[in-house]
Amino acid sequence: PSDKRLDADISPKPTIFLPSVAETNLHKTGTYLCILEKFFPDVIRVYWKDKNGNTILDSQEGDTLKTKGTYMKFSWLTVPERSMGKEHRCIVKHENNKGGADQEIFFPSIKKVATTCWQDKNDVLQLQFMSTSAYYTYLLLLLKSVIYLAIISFSLLRRTSVCCNEKRS
């Protein structure tokens, strides 16, 4: 349509999400998510492969949705525990890809990411505890500051009202 500028970048913009630690520990699977946004026109093809493989993997995708004159689509790949050590790629075919080539979005091995980030499962709990503690500490400090503000404001207002009353007498 005529509402699209010719110089505008209307190729798919990817946002990726890796499987959560909770999902991999609880369900022994991992879901990789690729969200493609701000592309035009709406004709797009998304599929998944292993990093060095040519076989198209079984994946799912949502409907193409219109958002503010452009489109968005999401696709996800759920891999079993035995495939979590592999790297994967999401391949996007769209007529406005830069250079006219397929866009390949690489996803690292979840086992590699998990072992790099967390040496021990207790590290995750420790991080959660630290985050929660920091949250409540900052909340307490904010509350303390508000109380001090109220006390100082009350004292200053009372002082000015006392000063003003003495001058009138």
Curated annotation (Swiss-Prot):
It is found in: Membrane. This is T-cell receptor gamma chain C region DFL12. It comes from the Eukaryota. Disulfide bonds: none annotated. Gene3D superfamilies: Immunoglobulins. Residues 158-169 are cytoplasmic. It is a single-pass membrane protein. The chain crosses the membrane at residues 137-157. One of its GO terms (cellular component) is external side of plasma membrane. Residues 1-136 are annotated as: C region. Its main location: membrane. Keywords: Immunoglobulin domain, Membrane, Receptor, Transmembrane, Transmembrane helix. CDD domains: IgC1_TCR_gamma. SUPFAM superfamilies: Immunoglobulin.
